Regions:
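The structured alpha-helical core of multi-pass membrane proteins
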Residues: 2-656
């Protein structure tokens, strides 16, 4: 049983003009809009503007793009794929069977900070683009226009972006050409700016400038979109991203150099304007603002879609509660999560209203994504170890990038009070939610008691044959939460045998296994008692929704076609007309009672878990079951059973 919707993805993976064009529209929106605010942020650090400062800052930008984006992500991370998929959670899925059980912490820290970055990116990119209007008139309402565009971006998510998404690649191609051409044109006014390619100027700046920490914090903004290259690996493929990056990097560097040239030609006024718009000819300013706004929308769209994908993966990895996921288009992988869309919209609006302009947002930007990159570095080190890479290379790689990213982290921490606290607060809340969810699931799983299933074959067969028991359903389906082969959840047996004996023609036990690979969707079926009891194991990839009803229907059709089971109704009037028997699902839901445990920390964790669960959906919907065919049986989750003996007395005495 496998999904058959790979053709569009395979098309995007082919190296060719179309594949490269699609890659430009999907992958490079975030990093491609960095020129809107990086140089402006550098000029606002308070460092004296002179040739050495600008050459040093530009050299830092060029070598950050080279070391961080090109070498770490393009050359190394893109090779660490999970069946073609990339991103920090896909990387973790490859490693979660390692003996180091704490490795999940790296994944949820990285995912939390990456999601926090997804709140600030739409705010700063759209705001900076609209602020270009101030070059035309200082009286234009930047904030209302920005909020209007943000509202439209989030509103259209429910309809999908398939139709306009096809044009993103063409738009971004024009955008990058605009960056490169305008940058190259500006360079001609100050050719000495090309000296910034020499890393010597970066070293001089970092060793001599008293404001080097602040400058590095601003420089880091040029590579914040690097993580997207890795996260979008599954959409476009390694070769398309690698080849496209050569073009994108060249255009970005030309634009940064062009902005630097303009600054050195206008040292007195440079800090009061945005150099990005200043290098544009006056006749092209409106066009540049429109293009910048469009690029900001593309970048925002990529971040929103990326957030949906990350949380979808987190659900199957048991990092996040199940939520209602919609598929607004037929494009594979395009998701829409209504609750998250609303939460992101509120978050972005609050960021815009709180910081008011892009200069203040720059202080909030960069800190969270630095932590994500550091977590990716650590996970990559473990991955390289599993691939048998020489230990000396792993130590050099991890040591070098832990130092580089550690310095960037320290530099960005200098902006904590000015705004960095905001994304760290968001990331901290998300981390707490994931941490609680992971541990609560472990607690629930730990206290599920199981029994050997084969001990109950006979009694289940006897119940089926006992016509004095009213027939509950023709086909009775349970999801078995026992994670041991040959075992069954004892509450499941209690439901069939003790609570209300349930007679059925066939009993089906569904075992769900979430695979470490992204697109796995397969099953195996074992007949435990002929014509009575069946066990179906479904293996589901971490990017696939567990739509159990749909998959079971396909499984049953396969079994009927191969004549391994006869599902025609046992009622004579229905059987002679070939009508199949009905299906009924029973879900065993364990309810945690704090008074069953003396562990206060555990009680607090489970209480928070219950609160977090309210933002999700119930188990029948989470498993994609037809709720009209589902019965939920609630049972207590017993942690520590306190059995107190009751004393027998001869006669009750009256109370005085």
């Amino acid at each position: 049983m496998r999904e058959n919707s790979e053709s569009s993805v395979a098309c995007h993976h082919r190296v060719g003009f179309l594949g490269l064009l699609v890659t430009l529209g999907i992958v490079f929106g975030d990093i491609g809009t960095s020129p809107l605010y990086v140089m402006k942020a550098i000029l606002h650090t308070g460092e004296t503007i002179n040739q050495n400062t600008i050459l040093g800052a530009l050299s830092c930008i060029i070598w950050t793009l080279t070391l961080q984006t090109t070498i770490k992500y393009v050359c190394v991370a893109l090779r660490a794929d999970n069946n073609g998929e990339g991103g920090i959670l896909a990387l973790y899925a490859l490693l979660r069977k390692m003996k180091r059980k704490w490795i999940y912490l790296l994944a949820i820290i990285g995912a939390s900070t990456l999601l926090a970055d997804g709140i600030i990116t739409p705010a700063i990119t759209v705001t900076t683009a609209i602020e270009g209007l101030e070059s035309i008139s200082s009286h234009l309402p930047v904030i209302p226009i920005t909020l209007g565009i943000i509202t439209i971006i989030f509103f259209v998510q429910r309809f999908g972006t398939e139709s306009i998404g096809k044009s993103f690649g063409v738009f971004m191609l024009i955008w990058f050409l605009l960056l490169g051409v305008m940058g190259a044109f500006s360079i001609t006014s100050y050719p000495l700016i090309l000296k910034a390619i020499n890393p010597y100027y970066a070293i001089v700046l970092l060793t001599q400038s008293p404001e080097w920490f602040l400058i590095l914090g601003a420089v880091f903004l040029c590579t914040t979109g690097a993580e997207a290259l890795y996260s979008d690996l599954g959409h476009c493929g390694r070769k398309n991203i690698t080849i496209s990056w050569l073009f994108v990097k060249a255009m970005l560097i030309l634009n940064y150099l062009g902005q630097g040239a303009w600054v050195l030609n206008h040292i007195q006024t440079a800090s009061s304007v945005n150099p990005f718009f200043s290098i544009m000819p006056q006749s092209m300013l409106i066009f540049a603002i429109i293009m910048a706004t469009g690029a900001a929308i593309v970048a925002s769209q990529a971040l929103i879609s990326g957030t949906f994908s990350i949380l979808s993966e987190a659900m199957n990895l048991h990092f996040w509660p199940r939520m209602r996921i919609k598929h607004p288009t037929h494009v594979k992988g395009q998701l829409y999560i209504p609750v998250i869309n609303l939460a992101m919209y509120i978050g972005v609006v609050l960021i815009i209203l709180l910081f008011r302009d892009s200069s203040h947002m720059e202080a909030a930007y960069g800190l969270a994504i630095t932590i994500t990159m550091l977590m990716t570095t650590l996970l990559l080190g473990f991955y390289l170890r599993t691939k048998g890479v020489a230990r000396i290379f792993i130590l050099l790689f991890m040591g070098a990038y832990c130092v580089i990213e550690g310095i960037f982290l320290a530099a960005n921490l200098s902006k904590f009070l000015a705004g960095g606290w905001c994304t760290m607060l968001i990331g901290g809340i998300l981390f707490l939610m994931m941490y609680v969810w992971v541990h609560a699931i472990k607690i629930r799983q730990h206290y599920i008691s199981t029994k050997p299933l084969d001990d109950y074959y006979q009694i289940i067969s006897d119940i089926k044959a006992d016509e004095s028991i009213p027939k509950y359903a023709c086909n009775l389906v349970y999801v078995n939460h026992a994670n041991k082969e040959g075992a069954v959840d004892d509450k499941l047996l209690y439901s069939i045998i003790n609570k209300q004996p349930k007679r059925a023609d066939h009993y089906w036990l569904i075992n769900l296994e979430f695979a470490d690979t992204p697109d796995t969707l397969e099953y195996c079926c074992e007949t435990l008692v002929p014509d009575t009891l069946y066990s179906i194991t479904m293996r589901i990839g971490f990017r696939i929704e567990p739509r159990v009803s749909l998959y079971l229907r396909q499984v049953v059709e396969d079994l009927v076609a191969s004549r391994k089971v006869d599902l025609r109704s046992t009622y004579p009037s229905l059987r002679k007309n070939g009508i199949p028997g009905d299906f009924r699902f029973i879900i065993i839901h364990r309810v945690y009672y704090p008074e069953s445990s003396n562990n206060r920390q555990q009680n607090l964790l489970m209480t928070i878990y219950a609160l977090i669960g309210k933002i999700g959906i119930d188990e029948p919907k989470a498993l994609g079951l037809d709720t009209s065919m589902v019965v939920v049986e609630r049972v207590p989750l017993i942690i520590n059973q306190h059995n107190r003996s009751i004393r027998r007395i001869a006669q009750m005495e009256e109370e005085k």
